[in-house]
Amino acid sequence: MSVAACAPSGDGNAGRHKAAPPIRFDSIGIASTEGDCANADSACARVNILYPLAESETHHVAADAIHQTVAEWLLGRPGDDTRSASPDTVAAQFIAAFLDFRRANPTRTPRWTLTRAVRVVVDTLGVVTLHGVQEDYEGGAHGMTNTFWASFALATGKRVDVNDLVAPADTGRFRAIVEREFRKRRVFPASVSLADSGFFAETGGRFALPANMGITRHGLTLHYNPYEVAAYAAGPTSLTLPWPTVQDLLRPDGPAAAFAK
């Protein structure tokens, strides 16, 4: 059984004199189950997908960039170049794979789950920030969870990267601050090699910034997913830099400047 729902995130009864938001978000939900999911001892597959659909009459470039990023998170997986055609296809393919497994293993009672959830966590001061989660379990020793962050500047329409946040001359100082916080989170003293600790092997132990960065009201959130900079057993690493920590490095005309005031 599959259920899809669409509900606008804004106030549909707002007064006609109220200015329309730069980007309007509708929440789309897809839920699908297969098997006897009410019985914990029975085979079951569950799919839950929730994401925002961005629309705008004035900020088309930003809305398109947001749409592309949401699609990337919903339809693919990190390290896998294949991509499903649509969220409905993601659900259908997962259920089909579950049924194939059941036919090949009729005596087993697998419990499979797939979750794709994307939320708008910031929509103010000319910035939209998305937070996304992928969770997959298809049996085995463990499932897989990936977390995503991305911010978009409405003024340019582009996804924000480190060069939008700090000037090139300050990138080294910014990276040093992030590394310091990373080491605190991982309890690695400055004297300990990251490579010897099992991190950043692909860069020879040299610290690197993550692809996932998000502007929030409280600070800049950065996230490293499993396998991104270490083995799966090391788990993910997430940290938030309070704005006072990096305020002196921020571009005064950049998308994060207004949040740090």
Locate the predicted segments by residue:
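Compositionally biased intrinsically disordered regions enriched in Thr/Gly
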Residues: A7-K261
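C-terminal motif of bacterial Sec signal peptides marking the signal peptidase cleavage site
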Residues: V3-A5
